[in-house]
Amino acid sequence: MAEKTDNSGLNIEAAEIVVIGGSGGIGSALVRELLERLPSCNLHATFHSSGGDLDHPRLNWHQLDIRETGQIEKFASTFERVDWIVNCAGYLHGSKGGPEKNIRSFDCDFLSENIRINTMPTLLLAKNFSAALKKSASPVLATVSARVGSIEDNRLGGWYSYRISKAALNMALKTLSIEWKHSHPRGCVAALHPGTNDTALSRPFQSGVAPTDLFDPAYTASCFVDLLSRLGPDRSGQFWTWDGKNLPW
């Protein structure tokens, strides 16, 4: 059977792939999908406090606190080459609170935590993995964003901190894509909207979601692998839905 390659000649099936947040709902589904679909890939997945439940000879687990600059620097220094980095880590609610319904609920600490998890890690990954990504024939850096981070698409309001952190993430990715035209001309930077998935992150907010609009993470992961396999320089700097449609920034 012929090896699957993209337009650059990269053997996708044997790619070196890093999945950040690989023990989460979407992240763990993506790890499983990549191992199944790309039978020769070498996969590295990170977890925050508890490791993933999957054991596989081509899967390497790494504990990583994405809020800590030093940990990301140390993690990145262990890689000679990386083809894909997919950041699936995200924060919507936790001990510091949840999405605000109105401005009266706004809290600076909650906004800071959203930015520390939803925005800054992608910039640190781009910075510290730059050399390893440059050695790929077709590097991809993609982060799971959210439609609520689209300024043009914001019609409902609310959720100040989450929206702000995702909008900032989108700006970071768009800006990085412009730099990559010169520094990584064979590469692609992408923001990914996963839709609403049946995960711990979205579970408190699923009551108003139609069953047909609530996705199994395995479905989203399959769509993401389809999309990632088609990304290249001509598609860099865009905001994609799980099914390959463009969203406005």
Regions found by a protein language model. Name each.
Residues 19-20, 87-88, 139-146, 188-191:
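Structural signature of the Rossmann-like NAD(P)-dependent dehydrogenase/reductase core
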Residues 20-35:
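N-terminal Rossmann NAD(P)H-binding glycine-rich loop of SDR-like oxidoreductase domains
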Residues 32, 123, 167-178, 187, ...:
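Conserved active-site helix of classical SDR/Rossmann-fold NAD(P)-dependent CH-OH oxidoreductases
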Residues 35-55:
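Conserved glycine-rich Rossmann-like NAD(P)H-binding loop of the short-chain dehydrogenase/reductase
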Residues 64-81:
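Conserved Rossmann-fold cofactor-binding substructure of NAD(P)-dependent oxidoreductases
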Residues 91-95, 99-115, 134-183:
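Catalytic loop of short-chain dehydrogenase/reductase
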Residues 187, 191, 199, 203-249:
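C-terminal helical subdomain
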